[in-house]
Amino acid sequence: MKLVKLSLVAALAAGAFSAANAVSLEEAIKDVDVSGMFRYRFQSDRYDEGNGVIANGYNSSKNNEHKFKSQLNFKAALDDNFKAFVQFQYSTTENGFGDTRNSRGELVRSVGTDTHSTFAVQQAYLEYTNEAYATNVIFGKMEVNSIWTDDAVGTGAKVINNSIDGLTFAGYWFDSFNRADDGDFGSASIGDASLYGAAVLGDFDPFAFQVWAAYSASWAYLYAVDASYKFAFGEGMDFKIEGQYLGNSLDSDKKDRLKFKDGSFYAAKLSADISAFDLQAGVVGYGDKDGISVTTLEDTGRVIAPGKQIFYSDGSNLTGDLGENFFYFAGVGYTFAEKLRLGFDYVGGTTKITGQQDVDKNEYVGSVSYAYSPKLTFSGFYSYLTEDQGSFNGDDQFIRLEALYKF
């Protein structure tokens, strides 16, 4: 973040936080922090069922996607104990020429360059700070920031306390979520209800942990634990071991009427930084072969989920799917001169569904990233996912190129 003195952007922020009594422009913007980002993504996805049927894809039937996202953040000190935050976001997905089909196989045409979408308010909240009790109270529209969500936004309140060194206590309530605008809530997600919860986060280097508990009204009780430990062998050989467990107990009506099952997720990962190399390996297990179960509320949440496609494949979607999954993974990367990183990752395993043949899945990912400057990064990856079920063989090739600027 940087302090803005006088600019068009800061004037816009001043307008967002105008008081009942007029003040000078210089006075209004003197304590406004401005930050933000701009991201452009080009991506293309091609799925081949192995019998000549190609869904989506590139080349002659391309459905290339151009995704633009920009955020402008303004944080203003209103008084000694109050701050206001607003985030404006611009986000579009523009498809190239070709046939695009949705998850139901229906043809969707969305071709052309978008020149009409505008910035919208993504977050807007008021924050009260009591330094004597090391407590912050936040209420409004904000990112949920839970272990079950990635970047979901909800309307509600949080209370955060840091009165004990190394410990953070949090309580939260969300009355609604940006389910329609986000696009990463699953159709079977339990994110359709108010969420009440608490968390304890501890960081006592080299040991850290998180304990989460929540109640999704009339849906489920959710709980999660994350623990990690760091250790080293000499200079330049740093290791970290991490374990996670997430579970939920669904309302009996949802089990009986919708045939859902209680969710259970476990994962373990060992990672290492040895000189210019970074390595990781581990296992992940979750799901139920007899009914739909849910692990996360939105996208892949903050769980251990390596790879780029496998956790979105049929039977393996973390926001709700039918299938018992067990995967193992490994990856290695090398960074040149602290700027250019090349990486390779592998994820493999099986999805089981009662009454069906097991699906063997393997994903191979090659990635590259280049830190042009502390603020500007270029990156990309190629992912190849195979799914084998008896005589059926499918493969999915996914490419993404990205430019990201932060300030």
Language model segments and positions:
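Internal metal/ion-chelating core segments
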Residues: 161, 166-229
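Solvent-exposed loop segments that connect transmembrane elements
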Residues: 48-58, 100-110, 176, 183-189, ...
